[in-house]
Regions:
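A structure-centric signal for secondary-structure junctions around beta-strands
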Residues: 5, 14, 29-30, 79, ...
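Nudix hydrolase/Nudix homology domain
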Residues: 30, 99-139
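Active-site-adjacent beta-strand/loop module that shapes the phosphate/pyrophosphate-binding cleft
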Residues: 3, 12, 71-94, 106, ...
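Conserved N-terminal beta-strand and adjoining loop/helix that marks the start
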Residues: 1-18, 39
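A short coil-to-beta-strand element that immediately follows conserved catalytic motifs
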Residues: 61-70
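Conserved Nudix-box catalytic region and its N-terminal flanking loop in Nudix hydrolases
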Residues: 16-56
C-alpha cells in the first residue's frame, strides 16, 4: 500500500517561506529543515491533511481550498504531495506555535532557501521541494 505524505509551502505577504527545523528526537531526519505536513489519514484528502498538519505543527489555521497543488512525486512506497498557500500577513503578524516535532522555525526568502546547504542524508521530499523551486526561479 502506498503511503501519502502531504506538505505545505507557506508564503507570507513579504514573499518569505516558513521553514521548520525538525527536533533532535524526531524519528526521521532529526535537526533537518522541513515543511509543515505529514501522512494523509484514510478519511482525508491530501488538501485536508495538509491543512490539518499545518495547524497541528505550527498553530496556523488555513483553509484547504486556499492550497494550490505544486507537485506530486513518488519515492519508494510514498507519494509526496506539495501544496503552496499565500497568507496575506507578515511574519510579525503570524503566531507560530511549534509542535513537539520541531524545535524552531524561520521565515526565508526564496534566495535564502535555495542557498541553504542540503546534507546528502536529507529527506527526499525536501530535496524535491528545493529542486522544484530552483526550476521555477530559473524559468
Amino acid at each position: 500500500m502506498v503511503k501519502i505524505v502531504s506538505k505545505a509551502l507557506i508564503k507570507n505577504r513579504n514573499g518569505k517561506y516558513l521553514l521548520l527545523y525538525r527536533g533532535d528526537t524526531h524519528p526521521n531526519f532529526p535537526g533537518h529543515l522541513d515543511l509543515p505536513g505529514g501522512e494523509v489519514e484514510s478519511e482525508e484528502t491530501s488538501k485536508t491533511a495538509a491543512a490539518r498538519e499545518v495547524q497541528e505543527e505550527t498553530g496556523i489555521c488555513i483553509h484547504p481550498n486556499g492550497l494550490k497543488k505544486l507537485f506530486v512525486k513518488q519515492y519508494k512506497n510514498t507519494r509526496h504531495v506539495l501544496f503552496e498557500i499565500a497568507i496575506d500577513k507578515t511574519e510579525s503578524d503570524i503566531s507560530v506555535k511549534l509542535s513537539w516535532e520541531h524545535k524552531k522555525y524561520r521565515w526565508m526568502t526564496l534566495s535564502e532557501l535555495l542557498d541553504t546547504n542540503i546534507p546528502e542524508s536529507a529527506d527526499p521530499y525536501y530535496i524535491y521541494v528545493i529542486d522544484y523551486l530552483k526550476h521555477l526561479s530559473e524559468a
